[in-house]
Structure formats: C-alpha cells, structure tokens
Swiss-Prot record:
It comes from the Bacteria. It comes from Staphylococcus aureus (strain COL). The gene is gcvPA. The glycine cleavage system is composed of four proteins: P, T, L and H. In this organism, the P 'protein' is a heterodimer of two subunits. This is Probable glycine dehydrogenase (decarboxylating) subunit 1. Keywords: Oxidoreductase. The glycine cleavage system catalyzes the degradation of glycine. The P protein binds the alpha-amino group of glycine through its pyridoxal phosphate cofactor; CO(2) is released and the remaining methylamine moiety is then transferred to the lipoamide cofactor of the H protein. It holds the Pfam family GDC-P.
C-alpha cells in the first residue's frame, strides 16, 4: 500500500524499472560517481499530525514582522494599500488561477477578455494608445522601454534621471552590458527632483530617449512638460515610469507627450510580500505598437459576428520570430494583472481619485508633523512619499521603531552617500492620524 504523500508501492517501482530496463534504483543512477551519491536515508524527522504541524508552522510564522502586526511607513516601490475583498475571491477561481498563455482563443475567451480589460484600464490611466498584457514588474518594463527606444531611433545614448528607482537603473545597466554600444547617461538631482539644466545640456541629436519617474523615487513630482520641451526637436523618445495610483489624480504622462509609459500595478490589489511577485505595465503610442514587448490582446469578430478576443500582432514575439523578436519576454503576470484590473474596476474612476487624494492629504499631514517636531523635510511637491533627515543612522532608528510595532521608512543611504541618514517615508490612505502621530513621536524620541 502506498503512503498518502508518496504514491508509489514497491510493485509500482519494479514495474517502472522493468519498463526502462533497469534492475534497481542504484543501477538507474549508475552514471553518477559513487563519491557524490548519498548512500544513506535522508535525515528527516518522522511525520506529524496536521494539527501539530500547523501549530509549529504558526509558531514559526509569528516571528515575522508583517503589516498585519506592525504599522508600515515603508514604500520605495512597494506600498501598503487597500485591496477590495473581491480581488482575492475572483483571482482564486480555478479558470483564472491555473490559466496559462491563452494561445487557443476558442477556449480562452474569459482569460483573453480579462487581459483586454487590463490593457484598456492602463491606456485610460496613462492617456496612451496601446498597452500590453503585462510585464514581470516595473523594472523590467522600464528596461524594455529603453531597449525599444534604442531599436526605434537607431541611436545609442539614453539620458536617465537619478530620480528613477535605483533598482530600475540597475536593471537598465544590466541590459546595457550585453550591448556594448549603448551609453547610459545619469542626470544628478537638484534636491529631490531632476536637475533640469543638466538634463537639457545632456540631450543632443544622438539621444535615443529621456527617462524620468513620476512621481520620482524620492517622492517628488517631476515637471514633465518642461522635460518634454527639451526633446521635442531632438527626435528622441520620452519615457515615463509612473505610479498608476498617482495617475488617478495627476495629469497623465500621455498628456505631456510621453512616447512610452511604464510602471508597476502593485498599488492596485497586489499585496506587499517579500518583494514580489508584481505586475509591470507597458503603454505606448500607435506608432510604436509593433515594437511593444510581450502579449497584446485585441478585440475582433468571429464568422457569426460575435465579439471575441485573440492574441494579436504575434509576429513580434519570440515564439514566432525567435532571435528577431522585439523582446524575449514569454510568460507574463496575467494573474496579478487580473488582480489589478479587478481592484481598479471595483474602485472605479472616482474611487481611484479619492484614494489618490487621501494619499496626498495623509502624506502632507505627516510632513507637517515632522516639521513641527524639528525635523528637516526635504523640499518637493510629493504624492505619498517624502524625505526626512535624521541625526542618527536610519538602520539604527528603524531597529528601534520595530520595538514599537512600527516599520520605518527606507534608508536612502543604501542608494547614495548624499542621502546618508535620510529616510524615505511612505504614507498611504491606510495610515490613520493616530498612527502618523505615534510614528512622528517615536521618531523624535529616537532622534534625540
């Protein structure tokens, strides 16, 4: 009789060995040198009852610091936002949860329509013409946007703001290492925004694209209109890495002439967990549609006139063109894209706007409380993040804050020595006045 977790009897094993012409398990591994074979049983404890095992696992899990046990002011790309309850209920349906790339439209209409709706929502938020079905994360989307710019313009220089997420810049440099001819020029900051004079001076006729973040990594809102004016006559592309929740309130990049808008939909329905998985989005203009990486779902009609959805423009993709594909991305984040679509749909246009307003209001309240406490808060018009200077190392402050069940902000000294002892603080719609007041009070005590 087989074990409940190991569904093989000795008879099963013998039948399998006989089928492949081996006399024993040892003969099966005969090609493996004997000195690296483990010639004993694994040192594994005996099995436990499920109730006992659950108690043990819960005891281990209780050691974790989570946003359920602590109040989080940590952002830097991953945020603690409200997710409607309907999100988990919908994405747990088996037809979505287990679905793979819907190559066969006749049996994948639900999945295809869900992706189509995601693309539509992204286009509406960004004010762009076309969006793909998703990317791995915002960093991947950004790097792919830069590669598209090189390909489209046939130029080799890209000008990027140091206000971009430092990990997005790292991914770009990793991509660029495989293309020796590509030059990445990083523009310094003026406070917490891009130094526009240096940016303007760096843009020339050899520039493939200019890339900025909106709001940027330090929480400040860049002047997209001014930046776009620097590149209008240079035939360079304008790439904007944007927080999609902020676009519920801020003027979308497409309205400022952006050619490609990328980002991460984590703020919509995707929990903050271990650094992933996330869901990158990629939106662009009709002119660049045939160079978009990843899947595109289009709306069509069948031979009976019924509306249907299919994967379209597949000649761009690596399963068709191999080494000549616009990108090597294959599987995407369709389940997380669905989660974001459901969250956006449940909130609606007004709901997204209201939450965006709450983020600004709560962050501004927190700013004022830090200023009243005597902290230096760096200037800059912000959305839901801002930078505060401390007298003590941020790591030390954060270690002490945890004792009060508070997860402090991001240590910017990790990114640059210019921001040593500076904390990037995120304040979302979920943070209450009492939570903010307690955070500021404890931060003040620890900074003395």
């Amino acid at each position: 009789m087989s074990h409940r977790y190991i569904p093989l009897t000795e008879k099963d094993k013998q039948e399998m060995l006989q089928t492949i012409g081996a006399k024993s398990i040892g003969e099966l591994f005969g090609d493996v040198p004997s000195d690296i074979l483990l010639n004993r049983d694994l040192n594994i404890a005996e099995g436990e009852a499920e109730t006992t095992l659950l108690r043990r696992l819960n005891r281990i899990a209780s050691k974790n610091i989570t946003k359920e046990t602590h109040t989080s002011f940590l952002g830097a790309g991953v945020y603690d936002h409200y997710a409607p309850s309907v999100v988990d209920a919908m994405i747990s349906r088996s037809e979505f949860y287990t679905a793979y790339t819907p190559y066969q439209p006749e049996i994948s209409q639900g999945e295809l329509q869900a992706i189509f709706e995601f693309q539509t929502l992204i286009c509406e938020l960004t004010d762009m013409d076309v969006a793909n079905s998703s990317m791995y994360d915002g960093m991947t989307s950004f790097a792919e946007a830069c590669i598209l710019a090189f390909s489209q313009t046939k130029k080799n220089k890209i000008v990027v703001s140091k206000g971009l997420h430092y990990q997005a810049l790292q991914v770009l440099h990793t991509y660029a290492k495989t293309r020796k001819e590509f030059e990445v020029v990083e523009i310094d900051l003026d406070g917490t925004v891009t130094d526009l004079k240096k940016l303007e001076a760096a843009v020339d006729d050899e520039t493939a694209a200019v890339a900025v973040q909106y709001p940027n990594f330090y929480g400040s809102i860049e002047d997209l209109k001014k930046i776009h004016s620097f590149i209008e006559d240079k035939k360079a592309l304008f790439i904007v890495y944007a927080n999609p929740l902020a676009l519920g309130l801020l003027t979308p990049p497409g309205s400022f002439g952006a050619d490609i808008v990328v980002g991460d939909t984590q703020p919509f329905g995707i929990p903050a967990q271990f650094g992933g998985p996330h869901c990158g989005y990629f939106a662009t203009t009709k002119k660049l549609m045939r160079k978009v990486p990843g899947r595109l779902v289009g709306q069509t009609q069948d031979d009976e006139g019924n509306r249907g959805f299919v994967l379209t423009l597949q000649a761009r993709e690596q399963h068709i063109r191999r080494d000549k594909a616009t990108s090597n991305i294959c599987s995407n984040q369709a389940l997380n894209a669905l989660a974001s679509s459901i969250a956006m749909s449940a909130l609606g246009k007004q709901g997204i706007y209201d939450i965006a307003v709450q983020n600004i209001e709560h962050a501004n309240y927190a700013k004022q409380q830090f200023i009243k406490k005597g902290f230096e808060v760096l200037d800059g018009t912000s959305f839901n993040e801002f930078v505060v200077k401390f007298d003590k190392p941020i790591q030390q402050v954060n270690e002490e804050l945890v004792k009060y069940n508070i997860i402090g902000g991001f240590d910017l000294g990790v990114v640059s020595d210019d921001f040593k002892n500076h904390m990037l603080i995120a304040v979302t719609e979920l943070r209450t006045k009492d939570e903010i007041d307690t955070f500021v009070e404890k931060a003040g005590e620890l900074n003395d």
